[in-house]
Amino acid sequence: MFIHWGLYSIPARGEWVRSTEEMPEEEYLPFMKEFDARDYNPKQWAKEAKAAGMKYVVLTAKHHDGFCLFDSKYTDYKVTNAGRDLIKEYVEALREEGLKVGLYFTLLDWHHPDYPHYGDRIHPMRNHPECSNENRDFSRYIEYMYNQVEEVCTNYGKIDIMWFDFSYDDMRGEKWGATRLIDMVRRLQPGIIIDNRLEVSGEGRGSLYDCNPTPYHGDFVSPEQIIPPEGICDKEGNPMVWEACFTMNNNWGYCANDHYYKPASMLIKKLVECVSKGGNMLLNVGPDAKGNIPQQSMEILHTIGAWMKKNSSS
């Protein structure tokens, strides 16, 4: 199970709302005071994931807006209003159910003052010359990101999966300090599995596919919203480890007006297709601002769970 949850759940127009609407910081920041996680029940989330036949869960510790669901000493832009460390409760709940612990961590940060603003094609302030990058020091941002990843890898016990997101244009590889970053993650979390998005986005396959791996190639390919027609093999024909991630509707984060849910039967077919081609499937839910998984998503999970109970062994 993939879970996208954060401040963007409050305006309820999807996780990219700051970017798509070019929303200024002063308009977005007040959501932090509203985010109280009132109904957050990670134990229930874990039970639902397990009942649906899932083996691991990946939650957005930090998405592109820069807001942290964990307690960080490097920023006040975190879930302090809820009075809880949401990631701590999440990892404990998964372990109680025997599920593997996954954390999503974005490489982007639209809140940090040293992240490129004007001219970056996806930053909310990309078209605002007054947000010039003249006095921004990207190396300071990289150190900030490194320190936060170190916190996540240090403060929550064993983490099974680190799901970085994502590389684009010239923002990839060593631009992120990728070798140093991945070395630190593997040192602190031996045995962790890491995706390939220090190199690519959901459309790319990375250096493992080219049989010329970089030091930060990751462990699996992560196609987004697609299933490779023939599975994924590298250029020499060797099967690769891969995981396809899918939304239930058209958004990752909660979007109140998005009722375009895929039928459970379609998602089950996608699951079967992924497995038959040697891959995993990571299915997303987007809880609302209070922490409730939408009813339509719950119904889909229950239908998948009933099917898995009968057919998972095959």
Annotate the PLM regions:
Residues 2-314:
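Mature catalytic domains of secreted/periplasmic carbohydrate-active enzymes
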